[in-house]
């Protein structure tokens, strides 16, 4: 099962903007889920993380109803969604519910992700909506977490900003090459065209997602 988590700096966009992700993966044999989440400033980033945890629990428990395998859940996220994908990979699922597997998420891929929240706390145009505290930054930054067991693939476009390029390398440095065996910069892709490539069979990001799904 593929769960795709959209971006938008935790404060904009909607699952309806990202339905284009599904057809190519369905054609390859995957069941696809594109969940929504509430947006800042109406809720906090921490609340969004908890919403996504609840969404993944639901996916795990209902996967077979949609032809999916609850033991083969892959999460892919873009931008803020990549942050959420990394948070879900790091989740201690047995503390969420005793009947859940330790590795509910079997693998994840972050596209143009944000893994250290401190620079965002210091950006006034974002902090107005995100309202991050120093303590929240520590709780919400995957780059500060112990490396998870399952694999994480990190991708960014060569034509993205230096900060997105830095974050992509940061998660490899933090979690190491065993956990992050793929850390790549894709030529000819910016923050938006790299996402479109996820839905394009033959594109690197699409092929890597299929690998995580066990379909390549």
Language-model segments: residues:
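Alpha/beta-hydrolase superfamily serine-hydrolase fold, recognizing
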Residues: 1-216
């Amino acid at each position: 099962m593929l769960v795709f988590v959209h971006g938008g700096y935790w404060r904009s966009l909607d699952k309806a903007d990202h339905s284009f992700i599904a057809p190519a993966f369905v054609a390859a044999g995957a069941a696809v889920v594109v969940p929504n989440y509430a947006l800042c400033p109406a809720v906090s980033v921490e609340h969004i993380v908890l919403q996504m945890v609840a969404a993944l629990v639901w996916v795990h428990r209902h996967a077979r109803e949609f032809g999916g395998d609850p033991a083969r859940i892959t999460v892919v996220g873009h931008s803020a969604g990549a942050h959420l994908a990394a948070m879900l990979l790091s989740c201690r699922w047995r503390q969420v519910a005793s009947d859940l597997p330790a590795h509910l998420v079997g693998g994840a891929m972050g596209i143009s992700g944000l893994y250290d929240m401190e620079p965002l706390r210091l950006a006034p145009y974002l902090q107005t909506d995100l309202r991050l505290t120093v303590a929240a930054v520590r709780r919400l930054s995957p780059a500060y977490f112990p490396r998870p067991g399952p694999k994480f693939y990190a991708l960014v476009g060569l034509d993205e900003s230096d900060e997105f390029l830095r974050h992509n390398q940061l998660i490899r440095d933090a979690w190491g090459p065993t956990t992050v065996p793929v850390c790549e910069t894709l030529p000819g892709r910016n923050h938006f065209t790299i996402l479109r490539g996820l839905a394009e069979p033959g594109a690197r990001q699409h092929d890597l997602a299929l690998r995580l799904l066990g379909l390549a």
